[in-house]
Amino acid sequence: MSKVCQVTGKRPITGHNVSHAKNHTKRRFLPNLQTHRFWVEAEKRFVTLRLTPKGMRIIDKLGIEAVLADIRARGEKV
C-alpha cells in the first residue's frame, strides 16, 4: 500500500539525517497516515480511507460526500 494521503495527496519526501559532526545521510520523511472508516449516509455503507490528520480536518469541514466526489473525480476508486 502506498504512503499517500487520499485526501490531500501528501506523500513521503526525502532529506538528510544530520549528525553532530554534520555528516549527512539520506532519509525519508513519512506522512502521518491513519486508516479511518467513515459512514457515508447517501450510500448506506462505510468507506475506508488512508489519510493524514489534515485530511480528517478537511472532511470535518467539507463533509465526507464532497471529499469523496473530489477523490472519485481524480479517478481513484473508493
Swiss-Prot record:
InterPro entries associated with the record: Ribosomal_bL28, Ribosomal_bL28/bL31-like_sf, Ribosomal_bL28_bact-type, Ribosomal_bL28_sf
Cellular component GO terms, alphabetical: cytosolic large ribosomal subunit
Any one Gene Ontology molecular-function term assigned to this protein's record? structural constituent of ribosome
Read off the Pfam families from this record.
Ribosomal_L28
Q: Where is this region: Disordered?
A: 1-21
What SUPFAM superfamilies does the database record attribute to this sequence? L28p-like
Keywords linked to the UniProt accession = Ribonucleoprotein, Ribosomal protein
One GO biological process term is:
translation
Among HAMAP family, the record links this protein to:
Ribosomal_bL28
- Family from the record: Belongs to the bacterial ribosomal protein bL28 family.
What protein does this entry describe?
A: Large ribosomal subunit protein bL28
- State the organism of origin: Cellvibrio japonicus (strain Ueda107)
Gene expressing this chain: rpmB
